[in-house]
Every structure is written in C-alpha cells, then in structure tokens.
Regions:
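C-terminal "post-core" interaction segments
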Residues: 1-382, 386, 391-398
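N-terminal signal peptide
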Residues: 381, 402-407
Length: 407
C-alpha cells in the first residue's frame, strides 16, 4: 500500500477513495497500519481501544499466564513435568504463543502505559451491571502485539522514520465507499479514518427509500476467536497447573471451557475445522466516557447513492458517482434525499460522538486538517478546477486483503 500511495502522488493524483464494499475483514493489525499509511505523523497514533468481558475463566487464565511469565507454574518445575503436560516437541516458546492473549506484558492501557500486573489489566470496570477489563491498546512497537513476524506498522519499529513522511492526502480529499457489507477489520479502519482522521463516508445501495444509511452493517468487534482457538489456548493454560490445581479447575469455567464437548458436537464444520467463533473484544471509541461498544452505535454515512444500470457492468461508474457527490461543489444535492448531514456523520458534526450522544471535542490526535475533533460540521468541498479535475482520484479496494485497483 505504501508503494501504491507513493505512485499515486508521483502521478499527480489529488483524491483517494477507499472502496470497502463487501469487505469482511482480515488481520486486525492491517487496519491500524492502513490508517497510518495516510496519517503517518507521530501524533496520529491509532487509538484502537478494546476490552474483554471480565469473567472468571479469563481471570484464571490471566493469573496462570502471569505465573508462567515468572517461571512459577508447576509445569515449569522441571523438564520431565513439562513434557508430561504437553508432550514431546512442545517448548515453552510454544506455550508463550498460546497464552499471548492473556499476557499483560504485551498490551498497553488507554493512556499507552504498560500494565504492572494482570490484576491491573483485569480490573474489572463495571458498566450497566456488567463487568469488563480495563481498556486495552496494541503496543505497535511490540512484535507479539502485531502478529506478523517482521512486520512493522507505519511509524513504529522498522518503519519508525515514516513519521517524517508528509501526509499524502488531506481529510477532505479522501472518502470511504461502503455498501453495508463491512465488518471486523474493515470496521476498525473505518472507525479510525472517520473519528481520528475526519474522513467522510458514502454508502451505496440499501432499500429503495429516502433517508440515511449506515455504511457498516457487519460486526464492529475488535477481534474474533474461533471455538477451537479458544479451547487450545485454555488447554495450554490448564496444563501449566499441578494435578491438584487441575482437579480444582475442572469444576470452574476454565476447565469447562478447556474441555467443552457439546459445543463441538453441535457446531458446523468447514474444511475439517469448526466454523463457529465468538467476538471476544469490544471496540471502543476514543474519548467516549460511556465506553459503549461500537457495535451498539448508529453511524450514518455522510451521503448515500443508489446503483444505476451502468454501475452494474462498469465499476468505474460507481467510483465516478462517488467523485461527483463527494468532491464537487454541488455534490450533496446528488445524494439520496434525507441522507446527508446526519448528526452521527462527519459532515453532520458527529466526529467523536459517544454512545451517550455526547461529543468529546478534544479526543483523538489531530485530524487531517490539522485540528482536533470538534462540533463544527465539515462541509462538502468543491472539486479542483481545470487540469486538476482530470487527475482527481486513486481507488483502494479490498483493503484488508491488501489488493489494490487504480484508475
């Protein structure tokens, strides 16, 4: 993507469309990196706040992992005991990988500070008579957090010097194209681009009626775990214990999760692997005092358009429709009736609107216009005139799979 952006700038392109239609997501860290590709400044660090539900099984797993990191578990008492627990060929590095989700040392708090212990991470915090962990953030400088060996998010690790790269496009010169089929990592990057970047959204399709439309219709959860992934991780934690501990854990949620059977009997399978899974992490908006998961927030696009017959056979007609509505002076008049200036959209002043309906005007890093999020609606901007109009856009599509198209 970095090469794509550099080429687009070298070719004199002035606008960018993120075509996120039909995007079911992918590796979460790519969503954060995508944001940094267009906002490389050091002060533009993606928030990406998440949390777990604070239940007993998670707490037990975190405590045992904390003991494992300190070399205090029964399985670490000698090599024979470890082999009896996990079998030949399994190393402590392997177990370190399986328990990484419960490792307090490889995540940061809401203020980008390290956790001193599992207990500090776990909390719990109480909201609406339910309990959750404290807010968690990725440590983008930590390879355990980024999941890809040798991969560095723009502005961190091997790409630290990228913070000196000029921002390739201003917020008003970028737009996201949605069709309702956006979930998971797609929702993550959309949240960052909208609320930290002030990038507007246009939605296409929907029911044949006037009014606004949400661009994101899929899950807005921060991370999904398959059933078998959860079970393997819990088993790794379980077998770190002594025989007496395991007997005790068998009667707890930890043991019941590690050795669940009925769930696997009833679930569908795909490619020889269980198809079921669960979203284990909420995605939280920066500055939202209510800490409402994004899953429960309504977010209308800044504009909406219907499909036309030419768009069905020619995708460039879709992109042209985006340009006409989002980058031209009178573009808003071409949007579906009643679909503009919704209070939850960027142009309607909804940047950083929390689940309680309140806006934190000081949340987040600087926007693409060099100012922090505010209550002032961002108006639709006019297109460049003359020759500039001929070089109006690049299109990025299939973002989470990192496939790209240009025109």
């Amino acid at each position: 993507m970095r090469d794509f952006i550099r080429k687009s700038k070298a070719d004199g392109k002035t606008k960018m469309i993120f075509d996120l239609r039909g995007n079911g997501g992918g590796n979460a860290i790519l969503g954060y990196d995508t944001f940094k590709q267009v906002y490389p400044q050091a002060e533009q660090e993606p928030f990406g706040g998440t949390r777990f539900r604070a239940n007993d099984a998670l707490n037990q797993a975190g405590k045992i992992t904390q003991d494992f990191l300190a070399g205090k578990t029964f399985a670490q008492s000698n090599a024979t005991v470890f082999t009896e627990a996990f079998g030949r060929g399994v190393t402590q590095d392997d177990i370190f990988g399986f328990t990484s989700s419960f490792n307090y040392q490889h995540t940061l708090d809401a203020n980008n500070k390290v956790f001193r212990s599992w207990e500090q991470l776990f909390g719990p915090d109480e909201f609406n008579n339910d309990t959750f962990t404290t807010t968690l953030r990725y440590n983008y400088s930590d390879s355990i957090s980024t999941t890809y060996t040798g991969f560095s998010v723009i502005g961190f690790g091997a790409n630290l010097n990228e913070t000196k790269t000029p921002q390739p496009f201003q917020a008003q010169d970028m737009v996201m194209l949605h069709d309702g089929m956006c979930s998971s990592t797609c929702a993550i990057v959309s949240e960052l681009l909208k609320n930290q970047g002030a990038v507007r959204t246009i939605a296409i399709g929907g029911r044949p009626q006037p009014g606004p439309m949400q661009g994101i219709g899929g899950t807005k959860g921060a991370q999904v775990f398959s059933w078998d992934d959860i079970q393997v991780r819990m088993q790794a934690v379980f077998f770190l214990g002594s025989p007496a501990q395991r007997t005790q854990w068998n009667n707890t949620d930890l043991g019941r999760t590690a050795f669940a059977t009925q769930l696997f009997t009833r679930s569908a399978y795909q490619g020889g692997r269980i198809a079921g899974g669960v979203n284990l992490k909420d995605n939280l908006r920066q500055g939202d005092a209510s800490k409402t998961p994004l899953e429960f927030m309504y977010e209308a696009a800044d504009c909406r358009m219907f499909f036309t017959a030419p768009m069905i056979s020619d995708v460039t007609q879709v992109w042209k429709g985006v340009v006409d509505r989002m980058f031209k002076t009178e573009g808003r008049t071409m949007c579906v009736e009643g679909s503009t200036m919704d209070k939850t959209s960027v142009s309607g002043g909804g940047q950083f609107r929390g689940g309680d309906g309140k806006i934190n005007p000081f949340a987040g890093a600087a926007t693409g216009n060099g100012s922090r999020g505010s209550n002032n609606p961002q108006q639709f901007t006019g297109a460049a005139k003359g020759r500039a109009e001929e070089r109006v856009w690049w299109v990025v599509t299939g973002l989470m799979m990192m496939g790209m198209m240009v025109m």
